[in-house]
From Swiss-Prot:
It comes from Xanthomonas oryzae pv. oryzae (strain KACC10331 / KXO85). This is 8-amino-7-oxononanoate synthase. Pyridoxal 5'-phosphate binds at residues 111-112, 183, 211, 240. The modification N6-(pyridoxal phosphate)lysine is found at residue 243. Signal peptide: none annotated. It comes from the Bacteria.
Length: 401
C-alpha cells in the first residue's frame, strides 16, 4: 500500500476549508494606540483583545522592559537549569506566589506548554486519568492526549458529571482539571463544588485561570480566591501573563513539593530557553500595577454592566457572563461573519467565533472589554451592533457548504 502523501492531504483539507468558507486569516496590525488598532490603513476601535486591565502599553511597564533590555540584553540565552534563570525570573515567581497566596511558583514560556508540563510530569502512568470539562481550553485537552494518560470529559459545568467520570476511572492517579473562566462563553466554573468532588475522589484539582487572574477576586487574585479557595483545595493553578497582565508567558503556582517536582522533571520546562529577562521585568511591573490599581477592575465592572444592559435592551441574546468576555449569540456562521464585517466597516474590530471552535448553530460575536474603553465607546459599539443586525437581516447570506 502506498504511503499517504502529506502535500496531497494538506491540499484536500485546504479545498475543504475553502468550500466551507472556513479559511483562517491573520489580520496584520500596523500600530496600536490604547484600544485602537491600525489594520489595512484604517484605525479601528478594538473589542477583541485580552488586555483587560490596559497594562500592555502602560508607561511603567514599557519603561521596565526598556531598562531591563538595556541591562540584560534581548534574551535569556539558556534554559532555567543552565544559566537562563535571572533575578527577574526569581522575583516574578516570588511576587506572583505571594499575591495569590501560594507557597511556590514556576515560570513557563506560555500557558499551552505549562499545561502540557503539568500533565506530563504528574500523570505519567497509562492508568492515570485526567477528568475535564468538555469546554476546557484546547491546551488542557491536548496536554492530556500528549501526556499519554486517559482523558474523560464531563458536560459543561456539570459537577455530578465530573464525579461520575472520576468514579468510572478508579485504577490510576487522577487529576480534575478545569478552566476557571471559559474563554468562548465567559462563564465561571463552580470551583468550590469541583474542589469537593476532587477531594472526595482523591484527585488533584488543577485550575487554569488564564482569564480570571488580574480581573476577578479580591485584589485581582482570580477565581480561586474569589471562591474562597487556596492551595489546600487547589494545589496547582495556572496563571497566564499575556491577558490581564498584558505581557507574555505563564506561571504555575502550587505547593512546594508539586512545584519542585515540575522544575525537576517537566520536559517543557527543562528543555527550552527561559523567557527574556526584559519581558519578565515588564510583567513584574504589570503585576505590581494589577495589585495596586483597583480602579481598573472597578471600571471594568461598570463597562461590563453598561454593555450587558445596552445589549439586553436591544434584544440580543447574552450568555451567563459577568467577565470581560461578552459573547453575543448569532446562530449561523454566515450571520456572524456578516455581522463582524459590518462592524469593521463601522470602525470596530470584534472577533467572529464559529465552528469548529464553537458548536454548529452557536456562532457568536466575542466582545472583550478593557479598562481602557470609555462608556462612549461601549455605547457606540452597541449602536453599531444594532445597525449591523438590521443590515444583515435584510441581506441574503452565503451558506457554508
Amino acid at each position: 500500500m502506498a504511503r499517504p502523501d502529506l502535500h496531497g492531504r494538506i491540499s484536500s483539507l485546504r479545498k475543504l476549508h475553502v468550500a466551507q468558507d472556513r479559511v483562517r486569516v491573520r489580520r496584520q496590525v500596523g500600530r496600536r494606540d490604547g484600544v485602537r488598532l491600525e489594520i489595512d490603513g484604517r484605525w479601528l476601535t478594538g473589542f477583541c483583545s485580552n488586555d483587560y486591565l490596559g497594562l500592555s502599553q502602560q508607561f511603567e511597564v514599557i519603561a521596565a522592559l526598556q531598562d531591563a533590555a538595556a541591562r540584560d540584553g534581548a534574551g535569556a540565552t539558556a534554559s532555567h537549569l543552565i544559566c537562563g534563570h535571572h533575578t527577574a525570573h526569581e522575583t516574578l515567581e516570588r511576587e506572583i506566589a505571594e499575591w495569590l497566596g501560594y507557597p511556590s511558583a514556576l515560570l513557563f514560556g506560555n500557558g499551552f506548554i505549562a499545561n502540557l508540563a503539568v500533565q506530563q510530569a504528574l500523570l505519567s502512568e497509562e492508568d492515570d486519568v485526567c477528568v475535564q470539562d468538555r469546554l476546557n481550553h484546547a491546551s488542557l485537552l491536548d496536554a492530556t492526549r500528549l501526556a499519554g494518560c486517559r482523558l474523560r470529559r464531563y458536560p459543561h459545568l456539570d459537577v455530578e458529571g465530573a464525579m461520575r467520570q472520576l468514579k468510572g476511572a478508579p485504577e490510576g492517579a487522577a487529576m480534575l482539571a478545569s478552566d476557571a473562566v471559559f474563554s468562548m462563553d465567559g462563564d465561571v466554573a463552580p470551583l468550590r463544588a469541583l474542589s469537593l468532588v476532587a477531594r472526595m475522589q482523591d484527585a488533584l484539582f488543577y485550575v487554569d485561570d488564564a482569564h480570571g487572574v488580574g480581573v476577578l477576586g479580591p485584589q485581582g487574585r482570580g477565581c480561586v480566591a474569589d471562591a474562597g479557595l487556596g492551595v489546600a483545595e487547589v494545589p496547582l493553578q495556572l496563571v497566564t501573563l499575556g491577558k490581564a497582565l498584558g505581557g507574555y508567558g505563564a506561571v504555575v503556582v502550587g505547593d512546594d513539593a508539586l512545584v519542585r517536582h515540575l522544575a525537576e522533571t517537566a520536559r517543557p520546562y527543562i528543555y527550552t530557553t527561559a523567557l527574556p529577562p526584559a519581558q519578565v521585568a515588564a510583567t513584574l511591573a504589570a503585576v505590581r500595577l494589577a495589585r495596586r490599581d483597583d480602579w481598573r477592575r472597578a471600571r471594568l465592572v461598570e463597562l461590563i454592566a453598561a454593555f450587558r444592559d445596552g445589549a439586553r435592551k436591544h434584544g440580543f441574546e447574552l450568555m451567563a457572563s459577568d467577565t470581560p468576555i461578552q459573547p453575543l449569540l448569532c446562530g449561523e456562521e454566515a450571520t456572524v461573519m456578516a455581522m463582524s464585517a459590518a462592524l469593521e466597516q463601522a470602525g470596530f474590530m470584534v472577533g467572529a467565533i464559529r465552528p469548529p471552535t464553537v458548536p454548529e448553530g452557536k456562532a457568536r460575536l466575542r466582545v472583550t472589554l478593557s479598562a481602557l474603553h470609555t462608556p462612549q465607546q461601549v455605547q457606540a459599539l452597541i449602536d453599531a451592533i444594532v445597525q449591523a443586525r438590521d443590515v444583515v437581516s435584510r441581506q441574503p447570506l452565503r451558506a457554508s457548504a
